[in-house]
Amino acid sequence: MALRLVIAEKPSVAQTIAAALGVKGKQDGYIEGGGYLISWCVGHLVQLAEAAAYGEQYRKWQLDSLPILPEEWQYAVDPDKGKQFATLKELMHRTDVSEVVNACDAGREGELIFRFVYEVAGCKKPMRRLWISSMEDGAIKAGFASLKDGREYDALFASALCRAKADWLIGINATRLFSCLYGKTLNVGRVQTPTLKMLTDRDAAISHFQKEKYYHVRLDLSGAEAASERISDKAEADALKGACEAGKAVCVSFTREKKTAAPPKLFDLTSLQREANRIFGYTAKQTLDLAQALYEKQLLTYPRTDSSFLTDDMGDTAAGIITLLCEKLPFMAGVGFTPGIAKVLDSKKVSDHHAIIPTMELAKTELAALPESERNILTLAGARLLSATAEPHIFEAVTAVFSCAGTDFTARGKTVLSDGWKEIERRYRATLKSKPDPEDGENEGVTLPELSEGQSFEKPAAKVTEHTTTPPKPHSEASLLSAMERAGNGDTDPDAERRGLGTPATRAAVIEKLVKGGFAERKGKQLIPTQNGAALISILPDMLTSPQLTAEWESNLTQIAKGAADPGEFLSGIEAMARELVQTHAAALDGKKDLFREEKPSIGKCPRCGSPVHEGKKNYYCSNRECAFVMWKNDRFFEERKTAFSAKIAAALLKSGKANVKKLYSPKTGKTYDGTIVLADTGGKYVNYRIEVQKN
């Protein structure tokens, strides 16, 4: 009997697929039954090999070995995952296996994970592709009923392979180049470095910001407060105030304009991460991990998507989920809700996967039984589906302009005509433990009294209010994700192909690398570049730090995935950049050679030259290279007395020439005693010590 080998990205997904297909025979590293062998990768089982695989000369980080440009790329199995790779290879080569199904995540990285294993295992059997956006049993069965020819995804694999090779070429060469030049490991990445540049640019804008005072003159006109434009001079504002109080204000225009605020779009991954950061303070990685966990529990659709629409054939599915949400979510109790589902359906705006929404599995789940963080994300996605299909928010914007003392004053108001989707948002926000800061414009406007053109106010009450210009805010993960998403778009048509730094699936990992590498740090919800982060950006060329250039690469990778761009041409450009980097950066920048030199704490001053003394692994040494003063930790004097030469003892010797030490061992008597060690430096190659016995 011919068997079908199914390979998932991780064990939990393999188990879900097996359950949906009724496969129950657990074996070592796979599940068997019903004509299926279902196994799994454990993330990236196979990766591009390290530089040393291309020759011993690349084992050490040396400038003269750069650039490293492989002619034939090598691959390496993760040594910690070798057993599972061996299992997959054996299963692929079983004579009773007729075809292999790629059931890894339906996206660029999932394609790469499977293809690397398939290629390195030397498998030649036909490939099929499972491409689904939900882990519900019905979706899995439907996916297996309509498997695609794996070769239809060759362009997607080409894009993934180009991405991996580009990251390798830039990462290996730039990291080694600048690390050797500046004497410190400096991790440079194709996406992470321009992302760091965004943080340092914002930090610089804050540091260089000059606060300025400005003033408004405000008139009280029978319940309407009208304000002047900004006035930079206090005396000018005071003079205007006096003139107004002695004069007359006349309404020169009064307009009402009906406006509509459309409902928000459904979540793609980046917008979900932004909102979860703003509301709950979750990092981008935390949100992705939570969404992935919910996906694997069949409660949420595939999270790594860049689409905010559903396909045209999902109307009935969406309607069923909305009905379920109205029953399950407490804040919808008693709300009569008729969704406008058509506004979230648009197959033309769905690429690989549709927007993130809950699934019908919610019917079988008690929300209260979920971990709080997972419940928060699931409820957030549910609330967004309801808001996105609700009526628009309709309001009337009222503007009144008054003339007084030759100056215009403006009063603005807002009257809500229909809450629409904002009523759902308000109900949802009311359930949150901590209330997020309102978004720009959420609280704007007040109700103005009825006014008419020509209406006048004699000697109106006036006041001067003082204000200060505010600097830009540090990036939060929410704002940084937005900046990464918009990078390279410029003033292009909003419906044009988006570029951006990274992809929805990779942005969280980029941020984590910056934090773990010590180039950025979290302070509450803020992301701040560290001193090393700012220093790194200061030494790197624009070709490595430009968000626009990296966004163009990401756009090229998207075109390669569509079969519309040449992979070879793309990689040739990356290789040329690696060559140019090495050729144009043969030495450290003037004055910046010691930029990353860490100041070691001093334990005291050198008794010979007065320079700071530092602790090394084996000694305490003078920082002045011209001075020979050094105290060795394994000095025979201390070893004979069975006493560790600690930094505390060394500091005391440097400070006063003496250190009181308890329980010194006497080689003569075999007993211990308390004594004072005296530094007896003769200025020679070695430092001597002697004992002063403490008398009781």
Enumerate the language-model features and the residues they cover.
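Intrinsically disordered, low-complexity regulatory segments
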Residues: 1-164, 168, 471
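Conserved short loop/turn motifs at secondary-structure junctions
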Residues: 2-5, 103-106, 183-185, 256-265, ...
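C-terminal or mid-to-C-terminal helical accessory/interaction module adjacent to the motor/catalytic core
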Residues: 137-221, 256-260
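Metal- or metallocofactor-binding catalytic centers and their adjacent structured scaffolds
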Residues: 235-267, 273
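Conserved ATP-binding/catalytic motifs of P-loop helicase motor domains
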Residues: 126, 196, 300
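Basic, low-complexity terminal or inter-domain segments flanking catalytic cores
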Residues: 2-5, 81, 92, 120, ...
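Amphipathic alpha-helical transducer elements in NTP-driven molecular machines
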Residues: 11-18, 35-38, 42, 78-89, ...
